[in-house]
Structures are given as structure tokens and as C-alpha cells.
């Protein structure tokens, strides 16, 4: 049983763009922030498959192949078990399904923390295997040397500060960060260190809003918020959360749909028709002429 994927650029409800657009580039994303401001916020969503990328692409500036796929796709308890091979394969699918957005792929836990050289080997593997344009890694000041090392060797890097899911065991959970002066100062310092190291954009996740605003104002690179502030230079959500695939979602998620209910209702109707032998009907069958 198989379905052939083909990039469909026809105008339809599922494919609203009449013709392919030229793909954005990392420098163009970086240049969206001028004089400390981004006139139109950047839009980023996660994508893990070619078809998902095709549906999201025309509406986004960036598609993030997030290590959140560990939980969303594979049912893992956290992002910790995600492998480079998983990330490379899903990123390749997203690149094939898109033509406009900058595709960024997460570097999974354990693939970059040991040294800049390890990070280069992992990042170059991801980009060569997938065709993605950039990588994203978690960590602030401690990762600045690695970000600079990658940048100097032709690998664009998106940073990630604040609540960093790969460090959940150290942080002790997914609570918002920046609730005391030390945490708040560290978030801003981390963002500035990544900015100075050459990160082309910085995700700020799960921090108190005033801290997100302060970090955004402190850096030249665009910031992309998730549970941060509307004053960030862009926003990102996990697509499945935004679509309503899961009943329980973080506080910072707004559900723009209830696709889970639609899927369940559709599957129920299909099952009922199969059991009643009303599917397949005459219009789905081949008859001799």
C-alpha cells in the first residue's frame, strides 16, 4: 500500500499557491531585522514530512524540523532519545516538500555538546543528508564557541535560549524561566553571546515576557518566540499543537483547529461504512466494459 508524493502547485484548498515561489535564504531572514526592529514578524512552524511541508510552506518564512518529532511522531517521552538519523531523514522529506521556506533542522541531544568539532561533524552530516539550509542548537554562552566554529565553516546556526527541552533533566521540568534575577540575566547574556557568535536567529522559549523583550532588544539577530512575547521578531509553534492534535498542550499554545476530532470522526465514518459494506461503492470500483 503506497501513496506517491508529488509536489502539487495547482490552486486548490489544500494547495493554495498557484506557482512556486523562490526559496528564502538565511541572509534574507537575518536581514529582516533592521535597526533593532522587524517590521513584519517571521513565521515559523515545525514540519516532519513532505506533505506537511507542502501544506505549510507558502505561509511560513521558516520550517523547523524539530527534535520534538521524538514525542510528536515517535511517541517518545522526551526529545532526549532522538538520533541524527531520524533528524536527517525527516529534514530531507521537508526539503523535498517545500520550495519557499528556509528549512532548519534541530541538532539532537548528544550530537554537538562535546566539542565544536563534534558539532561540525554532526551538522555537516545533517545538511549533506537532508539539503536543509541551517541547524538549530540549544544553549547560550556555553555554546557560543561552537556557534562561531560552525558559522566560520559555512554552517548557519539558529540559537535557542530560555527553556531548553534537551536540558529538562537539569532544569527539573518545563517551568518558565526568568523568575529570578539570576535566571533573567542569564537569558539575556546567553542571547547576546549567541548573537556575537554569529547566530542568524535565536529562539526564545518559555520565559517571562519582560525578559523576552529585553533579550530581543539586546541582540541584532531576529528572535523567534515560543511562550515568550509578541514583541519577539517572530513566532514558532509545534504544528500538531497548533492544529489541535493533542488534548493537553503547553499554556503558550493557541489551538487554531481541532484536527484530532476531525480525524477521529472521519475514521469512525470509514469504519462504519466498511462494516456496513457500503464502502467501497460503485464509484470506487472497476467494472468490466
Curated annotation (Swiss-Prot):
One of its GO terms (molecular function) is 3-methyl-2-oxobutanoate hydroxymethyltransferase activity. Its cofactor is Mg(2+). Residues 1-15 have a biased composition (Polar residues). It is an enzyme of class 2 (transferase). Residues 1-21 are annotated as: Disordered. Keywords: Cytoplasm, Magnesium, Metal-binding, Pantothenate biosynthesis, Transferase. It catalyses: 3-methyl-2-oxobutanoate + (6R)-5,10-methylene-5,6,7,8-tetrahydrofolate + H2O = 2-dehydropantoate + (6S)-5,6,7,8-tetrahydrofolate. Mg(2+) binds at residues 67, 106, 138. GO terms for biological process: pantothenate biosynthetic process. Its main location: cytoplasm. GO terms for cellular component: cytoplasm. It is found in: Cytoplasm. InterPro entries: Pantoate_hydroxy_MeTrfase, Pyrv/PenolPyrv_kinase-like_dom, Pyrv_kinase-like_dom_sf. Pathway: Cofactor biosynthesis; (R)-pantothenate biosynthesis; (R)-pantoate from 3-methyl-2-oxobutanoate: step 1/2. CDD domains: KPHMT-like (cd06557). Transmembrane segments: none annotated. Its EC number is 2.1.2.11. The active site is at 205 (proton acceptor). Binds 1 Mg(2+) ion per subunit. 3-methyl-2-oxobutanoate binds at residues 67-68, 106, 136. HAMAP family: PanB (MF_00156). Catalyzes the reversible reaction in which hydroxymethyl group from 5,10-methylenetetrahydrofolate is transferred onto alpha-ketoisovalerate to form ketopantoate. Belongs to the PanB family. NCBIfam families: panB, PRK00311.1. Homodecamer; pentamer of dimers. This is 3-methyl-2-oxobutanoate hydroxymethyltransferase. It comes from Erythrobacter litoralis (strain HTCC2594).
